[in-house]
UniProtKB/Swiss-Prot annotation:
Name listed for the protein in its UniProt record: Cytochrome c oxidase subunit 2
Function: Component of the cytochrome c oxidase, the last enzyme in the mitochondrial electron transport chain which drives oxidative phosphorylation. The respiratory chain contains 3 multisubunit complexes succinate dehydrogenase (complex II, CII), ubiquinol-cytochrome c oxidoreductase (cytochrome b-c1 complex, complex III, CIII) and cytochrome c oxidase (complex IV, CIV), that cooperate to transfer electrons derived from NADH and succinate to molecular oxygen, creating an electrochemical gradient over the inner membrane that drives transmembrane transport and the ATP synthase.
Lineage per the UniProt record: Eukaryota, Fungi, Dikarya, Ascomycota, Saccharomycotina
Organism: Candida glabrata (strain ATCC 2001 / BCRC 20586 / JCM 3761 / NBRC 0622 / NRRL Y-65 / CBS 138)
SUPFAM superfamilies assigned to the protein according to its UniProt record, in alphabetical order: Cupredoxins, Cytochrome c oxidase subunit II-like, transmembrane region
Complex and partners: Component of the cytochrome c oxidase (complex IV, CIV), a multisubunit enzyme composed of a catalytic core of 3 subunits and several supernumerary subunits. The complex exists as a monomer or a dimer and forms supercomplexes (SCs) in the inner mitochondrial membrane with ubiquinol-cytochrome c oxidoreductase (cytochrome b-c1 complex, complex III, CIII).
GO molecular function: copper ion binding; cytochrome-c oxidase activity
GO biological process, one term: ATP synthesis coupled electron transport
Alphabetical list of InterPro entries matching this protein: CcO_II (IPR045187), CcO_II-like_C (IPR002429), CcO_II_C (IPR034210), Copper_CuA (IPR001505), Cupredoxin (IPR008972), Cyt_c_oxidase_su2 (IPR014222), Cyt_c_oxidase_su2_TM_dom (IPR011759), Cyt_c_oxidase_su2_TM_sf (IPR036257)
Subcellular location: Mitochondrion inner membrane
Length: 251
């Protein structure tokens, strides 16, 4: 019981990674994810209003007709109520649709990114290419990222989430992720960054991220891609610009 309460408490104060008994989104680190959270909360508010009204109507109808089973014979055609129950749902849908479309187009826009990272999905690992940077050998910086097996996990590392190499990016920098697949369809998804994009073989999809705080953010392949689908984690380390430049010099 104590472990359960501790886990629930940690979910409230810190939720950058998937946790047991988690019932809400991970903490957002990008404007896109902030918009997604706000849209979700607004829609849930409207849903509770609708649930309350419908429940009240059902309760009233059951209460009324249980006392007088013949009352329905005295009900006549009511144009006013028909207009109300047609217009009210339409207004609610419009209130939900407009912010949703705006957010959808904002998340899809990638304008003048400061750097580009290419993520290629394989069965069953990820390969990353920093196409804007070249090492001392004149080659593009690239590496592969594999899940750490259970028997090699160290204390504090997360099962099926930690990887042998991390994607290191600077904070407060407009980053473009170009995503594709090498064999079957994969999906590049990082909840805290508001990123979820298909990795289709033969096609390049792109998504942008502006990470606003330092930290380690985890994701996974979100498209069933074979027997080891669960062994395709994604680990993003967001660091300050000086630390990022230091990391680049080490590559």
């Amino acid at each position: 019981m104590l472990n359960l309460l501790n886990t629930l408490f940690l979910n409230v104060i810190s939720n950058d990674v998937p946790t047991p008994y988690g019932i809400y989104f991970q903490d957002s680190a990008t404007p896109n994810q902030e918009g997604i959270l706000e849209l979700h909360d607004n829609i849930m508010f409207y849903l509770f209003i609708i649930l309350g009204l419908v429940s009240w109507m059902l309760f009233t109808i059951v209460k009324t007709y249980s006392k007088n089973p013949m009352a329905y014979k005295y009900i006549k055609h009511g144009q006013t109520i028909e207009i109300i129950w047609t217009m009210f749902p339409a207004v609610i849908l419009l209130i939900i649709a407009f912010p949703s479309f705006i957010l959808l187009y904002l998340c899809d826009e990638v304008i003048s990114p400061a750097m580009t990272i290419k993520a290629i999905g394989y069965q069953w690992y990820w390969k990353y290419e920093y196409s804007d940077f070249i090492n001392d050998n004149g080659e593009t910086i690239e590496f592969e990222s594999y899940v750490i097996p259970d028997d090699l996990l160290e204390e504090g590392q997360l099962r099926l989430l930690d990887t042998d190499t991390s994607v290191v990016v600077p904070v407060d920098t407009h980053i473009r992720f170009v995503v594709t697949g090498a064999d079957v369809i994969h999906d590049f998804a990082i909840p805290s960054l508001g990123i979820k994009v298909d990795a289709n073989p033969g096609r390049l999809n792109q998504v942008s991220a502006l990470i606003q705080r330092e930290g380690v953010f985890y994701g996974q392949c979100s498209e069933l891609c074979g027997v080891n689908h669960a062994a395709m984690p994604i680990k993003i380390e967001a660091v300050s610009l000086p630390k990022f430049l230091e990391w680049l010099n080490e590559q």
